[in-house]
A protein has these predicted regions:
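Membrane-embedded segments
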Residues: 36-134
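Short loop/turn segments at strand-loop or loop-helix junctions that form parts
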Residues: 44, 98-103, 244-247, 275-278
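Acidic-and-aromatic substrate-binding clefts and catalytic sites of carbohydrate-active enzymes
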Residues: 73-77, 216-222, 248-255
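Secreted/periplasmic serine-hydrolase-like ester/acetyl group-modifying domain
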Residues: 100, 113-228, 232-236, 319
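A contiguous, surface-oriented mixed alpha/beta subdomain in the mid-to-C-terminal portion of proteins
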Residues: 238-242
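C-terminal regions of proteins
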Residues: 253-319
Length: 319
């Protein structure tokens, strides 16, 4: 109750929730690695909740162990820090899915939302006192966080774990989903009645809404970060795929041609998959649980398109 961000006391799966997803994801990795020896990773923001890593496992070499590195508002800099940590400790980095959100992945967090996106000092090498001061500032500004922690504590008898304690998948039961066909569509059903009404009113039923303008967001400094990631991949012989994620097309822009060319120049055109401009996905509101988050049916479709008709990540022809 006195630790709403789960950063003061030693890490434990007890009352594990989504208060600070970056910190909890990375600490779960540190705690689990000696037992599970991960070698395959998904790096993503909250949009990664639409990816089921147990389905991805079907395309990985036998014996692979996968982990979802997820952070709210994840940036390419945050992904680079996690990849650098794995490289520093000489852990295997055999297979990677790197999800890129436009424009979020190339943004710089601002103070009002910094508590949700601030990086684990174990990975960022930032002084821990700075990390805790940011959380304290946020706590003072938002007393609702304390009340939220109290409510979660009262409901957690016995203690519950929201996320899969091994893979860190969005839901603990993700591995038990039927993977033989896409989940049922209409992810909007998960929205509350008011939120759904507002979304339908502002976007779906609005005849005057226009597609947002796409703007280039990858500058020289971000390109250097991308090249550093590629260098780590080359040292490890990593088999990787870069996925530009979809969002609801009448709210979020697709990637520009210039930015897409930069990604392709760094990682290879054959390794970059752009779903942000796929109107068959992005203009169907039922594919999203809200304008920013695609559903499991779309994650299923993306993995199928990337691997089913091409090569799996072990270099063998997929079925």
């Amino acid at each position: 109750v006195t630790d709403p961000y789960k950063t003061l006391h030693p890490f434990s799966l007890t009352y594990f929730d989504d208060t600070n997803r970056d910190y909890l994801s990375s600490e779960l990795f540190v705690k689990n690695y000696p037992e599970y020896h991960y070698n395959s990773y998904v790096f993503c923001s909250s949009r990664g909740g639409g990816i089921n890593t147990y389905q991805w496992l079907e395309y990985l070499p036998e014996g692979s162990t996968q982990f979802l590195f997820q952070a709210w508002g994840e940036t390419i800099t945050g992904i680079d820090q996690k990849i650098s940590y794995i490289d520093e400790y000489r852990y295997p980095l055999d297979n990677v899915l790197m999800l890129i959100d436009i424009p979020l992945s190339f943004s710089r967090p601002q103070l009002p939302t910094l508590a949700m996106s601030i990086k684990n000092p174990r990975f960022s090498h930032q002084p821990r006192w700075v990390f805790q001061m940011v959380l304290l500032y946020d706590f003072i500004q938002k007393p609702s966080e304390w009340m939220r922690a109290v409510r979660k504590w009262r409901r957690s008898t016995p203690p519950t774990v929201t996320f899969d304690p091994i893979s860190n998948d969005w839901e603990k039961g993700n591995k038990e989903l039927d993977l033989s066909s896409p989940p049922e569509k209409d992810n909007m059903r998960s929205l509350s009645g008011k939120a759904r009404t507002v979304f339908l009113r502002d976007y779906v039923d609005n005849p005057y809404v226009a597609l947002p303008e796409s703007k280039s967001v990858i500058d020289g400094s971000m390109t250097r970060v991308l090249n550093h990631i590629k260098g780590v991949f080359e040292r490890h012989g990593t088999n990787y795929r870069i996925i530009v994620t979809p969002a609801y097309g009448y709210k979020y822009p697709s990637i520009t041609e210039d930015d897409l060319r930069i990604l392709q120049a760094v990682f290879g055109e054959e390794n970059v998959y752009d779903f942000s401009g796929r109107k068959d996905i992005t203009l169907d509101y039922k594919n999203f649980s809200d304008p920013n988050h695609f559903g499991l049916n779309i994650g299923w479709q993306m993995l199928e398109e990337i691997f089913h008709d091409g090569e799996s990540m072990n270099g063998q022809q997929s079925y």
